[in-house]
Each structure stands twice: as C-alpha cells, then as structure tokens.
C-alpha cells in the first residue's frame, strides 16, 4: 500500500500541486506591494533619518561641545572641534558627520545631554558632488531650523519613552 501511494505522489507531482494550492489561495487577495515613488508608507516619529542640530528659542545653538556623541559613535562618523568663549563656556567651532560611515544607530541622539543632535524622519536625500556626504555644522543647523516644528512635535509625542 505504501508503494502505491508513493507512486501516485511521485507521478502526479503531489508537492507541486500543494504549492500551487497555496499560490492560488493568495493570488486573489489584496496586494501589499507599494509603488514607492508614487505611494509612501507612513513613517514613525521614532524613525532615524538624516541628522540635524537644534537651537534654543533665542537662536543660540544647543550644542555645548561635550563630545559625548563623538565618543559614543560606534562608526566614528562624528568629528567635533570646540573653542572656549569669553564667558568660559565651550561651543563647537566645527561639527561634522560623515554619512557614509554613519550607521544611523541613534546613540548620538540618546547621549546628548542638551538634546542638540537629533535624527529627523527625512528619508530621501542624495549627493551629486564628492564630499557632500560630510554634513557640516552649517548644513546640520539649516536642517534643524527648517524642520524644528516637526522635530519638536515628534519629541513631544515620544517624551514618555525617553
């Protein structure tokens, strides 16, 4: 009896028919593919995208040059140089992030004591020239100024988890 069932399963391609049954069952269901440039899926407020530097309400940059983000970065993508002011406080003279090295882990954002460096939910960006992958302090501050309302809203929504 065992040989007969084995014979029918082999010559009738039983495994192939079982696979085709699964394919046929899912053939008429709703598709889950998104046509990316035209359609976009919703992005979480915790998404880790392009970096930005924030300012205080009075316009002064938040970064105090503590260099915690530079130390905690596992990819060594952040470089900070600082200068001391007349009042004794430190501020950054240069702040650079190499986006080719960055792995977007979010450690820089978590380690910042003054909430200066943040990762926005900017997903789409490109480079046309060599060297544009280095995000300078001016570029990071410009991104922060442009998207401050969105960054603040995401922070407010996520405050219970920080």
Swiss-Prot record:
Family matches, as Pfam families: Fer4_7
Gene3D superfamilies named among the record's database cross-references: 3.30.70.3270
GO biological process, one term: aerobic respiration
Annotated residues for binding of [4Fe-4S] cluster 1: 63, 66, 69, 112
GO CC, alphabetical: plasma membrane
PROSITE patterns reported for this sequence: 4FE4S_FER_1 (PS00198), 4FE4S_FER_2 (PS51379)
Domain 4Fe-4S ferredoxin-type: 54-83, 93-122
Protein residues bound to [4Fe-4S] cluster 2: 73, 102, 105, 108
Enzyme class: translocase
EC code: 7.1.1.-
Topology versus the membrane: Peripheral membrane protein
Compartments (UniProt record): Cell inner membrane
Superkingdom of origin: Bacteria
Catalysis: reaction(s): a quinone + NADH + 5 H(+)(in) = a quinol + NAD(+) + 4 H(+)(out)
Cofactor: [4Fe-4S] cluster
Subunit structure: NDH-1 is composed of 14 different subunits. Subunits NuoA, H, J, K, L, M, N constitute the membrane sector of the complex.
Biological role: NDH-1 shuttles electrons from NADH, via FMN and iron-sulfur (Fe-S) centers, to quinones in the respiratory chain. The immediate electron acceptor for the enzyme in this species is believed to be ubiquinone. Couples the redox reaction to proton translocation (for every two electrons transferred, four hydrogen ions are translocated across the cytoplasmic membrane), and thus conserves the redox energy in a proton gradient.
Name this protein carries in UniProt: NADH-quinone oxidoreductase subunit I
Organism: Francisella philomiragia subsp. philomiragia (strain ATCC 25017 / CCUG 19701 / FSC 153 / O#319-036)
């Amino acid at each position: 009896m065992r040989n007969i069932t084995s014979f029918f399963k082999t010559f009738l391609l039983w495994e192939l028919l079982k696979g085709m049954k699964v394919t046929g069952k899912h053939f008429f269901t709703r598709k889950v593919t998104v046509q990316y440039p035209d359609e976009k899926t919703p992005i979480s407020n915790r998404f880790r995208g392009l970096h930005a530097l924030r300012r205080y309400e009075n316009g002064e940059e938040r970064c105090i040059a503590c260099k915690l983000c530079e130390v905690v970065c596992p990819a060594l993508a952040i470089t900070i140089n600082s200068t001391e002011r007349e009042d004794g406080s430190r501020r950054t003279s240069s702040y650079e992030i190499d986006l080719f090295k960055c792995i977007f882990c979010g450690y820089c954002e978590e380690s910042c004591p003054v909430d200066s460096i943040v990762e926005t939910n900017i997903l789409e960006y490109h480079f046309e020239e060599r060297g544009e992958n280095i995000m300078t302090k001016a570029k990071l501050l410009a991104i922060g100024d442009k998207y401050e309302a969105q960054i603040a809203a995401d922070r407010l929504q996520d405050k219970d988890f920080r």
